[in-house]
Amino acid sequence: MMNAEAKPGDWLGKVRWDANGLVPVIAQDAATNDVLMFAWMNRDALAKTIELKRAVYYSRSRQRLWFKGEESGHVQHVHEVRLDCDEDVVLLKVEQVEGIACHTGRRSCFFQKFEGTVDDGEWVAVDPVLKDPEHIYK
């Protein structure tokens, strides 16, 4: 829900938050423009991200802020934050520490590619596991 009367300096008020106070976020590699992951932010997460220059998301399952890399060490250093034309999606341009953004140990969460036709298609994992998740989360 956007504040239609957003004042100068009220940059958080310009964002169109959903009914749950969240906004979708895409993390993109700042150097290659590869899409790394999708997550959610609330106001606190976006403010912390700006303040720390480090990606902070909102975990819907844990109902709390999620500092990317807090368990895995795969921190995202934020180089740039953008808001889309409808003001309802945030884009983070990041440097991905150790090159792993996905909890599966892959560079990107978008590692499954559709192959085939509408009648016999399937999702195929096309990107390699860079690090076994068993060794990431102990």
Swiss-Prot record:
Chief location: cytoplasm
Co-factor binding details: Binds 1 Mg(2+) ion per subunit. Binds 1 zinc ion per subunit.
This protein's UniProt keywords: Amino-acid biosynthesis, Cytoplasm, Histidine biosynthesis, Hydrolase, Magnesium, Metal-binding, Zinc
Binding residue positions for Zn(2+): C85, C102, C109
Catalytic reaction equation(s): 1-(5-phospho-beta-D-ribosyl)-5'-AMP + H2O = 1-(5-phospho-beta-D-ribosyl)-5-[(5-phospho-beta-D-ribosylamino)methylideneamino]imidazole-4-carboxamide
Cofactor(s) of this protein: Mg(2+); Zn(2+)
Coiled-coil residue spans: none
Pfam family, one: PRA-CH
Cellular localisation: Cytoplasm
Keyword Hydrolase: yes
GO terms of molecular function: magnesium ion binding; phosphoribosyl-AMP cyclohydrolase activity; zinc ion binding
Pathway: Amino-acid biosynthesis; L-histidine biosynthesis; L-histidine from 5-phospho-alpha-D-ribose 1-diphosphate: step 3/9
Binding of Mg(2+), residues: D84, D86, D88
Biological role stated in the UniProt entry: Catalyzes the hydrolysis of the adenine ring of phosphoribosyl-AMP.
Record family assignment: Belongs to the PRA-CH family.
Protein name, entry field: Phosphoribosyl-AMP cyclohydrolase
Organism: Burkholderia pseudomallei (strain K96243)
Lineage: Bacteria, Pseudomonadati, Pseudomonadota, Betaproteobacteria, Burkholderiales
